[in-house]
Regions:
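Domain-level signal for soluble alpha/beta catalytic cores
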Residues: 1-372
């Protein structure tokens, strides 16, 4: 088993553009023109090809590209008992576009009566490891699941099952423990919790999304930090748990904007992760000063290369920004990656596979120049 630990000096978030043959296989399956066995065969082939390409580029971490998912987060929730979903009529609002992902809601107590599908997904990638690579498993954070079922659009429905948030939180913590323990038994030692809640908290209208005031939002921050920390505390001690803080990433659009200043004390100071993958690809993310709040010896992966546009960043400008960030956190605790995945949902961002690989080549070139 590989003993490598994430993050690496040049790294990536996790999702990749779906190849055309996978999109076609998914379309045929959804339309009843093929069965699951045929779909899985194509998924397997595409994942093997993806991992081979990642290795060819010289990266030390591998994922399945999230090729078996419709979205980065909802598929994970669909794997639990007590969670239902139906095709949406309105979608989720992004800037300039709505993400037409399934409405997902509580239909009973959240539980896990059988192995979560993501565990078998991980086993497939684990088998593709070699001495130079390690598989990581991405999943939405516990806070993301809590937000999904407690934000105003779902609150009344959730209250039909749960009398208070503590009951819901306890059930979420319990199912995460089962999933993480099963992943550990399958050989997983690197997990990434993807989390859009902090991006919403940082947005100037974030409080309205939670039906509270700017001051009241601090209590929500603490609740989300607490549930993440409870899950982290339950994990095996040698399980590396990182987090990716996102502002939404659908078809090259975004859901929230705002600097990290308003969430830094709680997120950077009190969340007990090993490393933060942070978006810093444009002015929506603000400056680097909040990084001074990153406590202990936690690491920061700077997401300075955008996945929302095919245009390649200026290498020297990125290098300069890395050194700017090192004014607030030592260079030896900094790393580099794209700002997000390339396809948080099946539709993917507006660039080609070739442009996607060019982005990863650039990340590696810059990281090698900065850190050697």
């Amino acid at each position: 088993m590989s003993n490598l630990q994430t993050p690496f000096r040049y790294d990536f978030v996790g999702s990749f553009l779906r190849p055309d043959k996978l999109k076609e296989a998914r379309r045929m399956f959804d339309n009843g023109e093929s069965d699951y066995t045929a779909l899985k065969k194509v998924e397997d082939e595409c994942i093997v090809e993806l991992v081979a390409k990642i290795k060819e580029l010289g990266y030390n971490v591998i994922t399945d590209g999230e090729f078996r998912r419709a979205t980065w987060h909802l598929d994970f929730m669909w794997g639990f008992d007590g969670v239902g979903h139906t095709p949406t009529e309105t979608g989720l609002p992004f800037h300039g576009e709505a993400a037409m992902v399934d409405d997902t809601y509580i239909v009973g107590r959240i539980g896990l009566s059988k192995e979560h599908p993501f565990v078998e997904h991980f086993r497939f990638v684990k088998a593709l490891e070699d001495e130079n690579t390690v598989a990581k498993q991405t999943m939405p954070s516990p806070a993301q699941v809590l937000a999904q079922f407690t934000m105003p659009f779902n609150r009344l429905n959730t209250e039909k099952v749960y009398s208070d948030d503590k009951e819901l939180e306890d059930d979420i913590v319990a199912v995460y423990k089962k999933v993480i323990d099963d992943l550990y038994a399958a050989g997983c030692r690197n997990i990434q919790l993807d989390d859009c809640t902090w991006g919403m908290f940082a947005d100037k209208i974030g409080h309205t999304l939670y039906g509270t005031t700017r001051e009241g939002l601090i209590e929500f921050q603490k609740a989300h930090k607490d549930i993440n920390n409870r899950v982290i505390a339950n994990a095996p001690k040698d399980m590396i748990i990182n987090t990716h803080v996102c502002r939404g990433n659908f078809h090259s659009t975004y859901a929230s904007e705002g600097a990290y200043d308003s969430v830094a004390d709680v997120l950077f100071g009190e969340e007990n992760v090993n490393a933060y993958f942070l978006e810093f690809d444009d002015e929506r993310s603000g400056g680097f000063a909040p990084l001074a709040k990153v406590s202990g010896d936690k690491k920061v992966v700077l997401g300075l290369i955008t996945t929302k546009s095919p245009k390649l960043e200026d290498k020297q400008l990125v290098i300069d920004r890395i050194h700017d960030a090192s004014k607030y956190i030592p260079l030896d605790r900094l790393y580099l990656s794209p700002q997000c995945g390339f396809a948080s949902c099946e539709i993917g961002n507006k660039l080609t596979e070739e442009e996607q690989w060019a982005k990863l080549k650039l990340v590696k070139e810059i990281a090698t120049e900065v850190w050697g």
